[in-house]
Amino acid sequence: MSENERLRADAGLPRAGSADRPVVEVAVGVLIRPDGDFLLTSRPEGKVYAGYWEFPGGKLEPGESVEQALYRELVEELGIQVVQTVRWKEQLVDYPHALVRLNFCKVFDWHGDLQMREGQSFAWQRLPVLVSPVLPGTV
């Protein structure tokens, strides 16, 4: 099985048994600089899909809103304090390991310098992105 087949991520063509899996809610931060570039980070070693590029963020904890989870995750992962988020879109993605709802939020304003607290790399990008591989569902 090729890497692309393994990482097929299309909720419109779900895998066998996908309907029985619970949906994992994930807050996703699309950090955008004034010049229009957006931030992608690489998944660190030890995590599923290590080395793949994605927007920063993470799973919602019980009782958290998308915004609360995003604020927490960006402190944990990047060491920044978000000033405000703007809910953007939702996307249901059928990964081999989980059925995931990505809750995208645009972030235009934050305090602090980026610190890669989980050993990940980062890159400011424009479309088409230059980093690879990119996790399906990201861009």
Model-derived features: positions:
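A generic structural signal for short hydrophobic patches within well-formed alpha-helices
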Residues: 130-131
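Short Pro/Gly-enriched beta-strand edge/turn motifs at strand-loop
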Residues: 3-15, 86-88
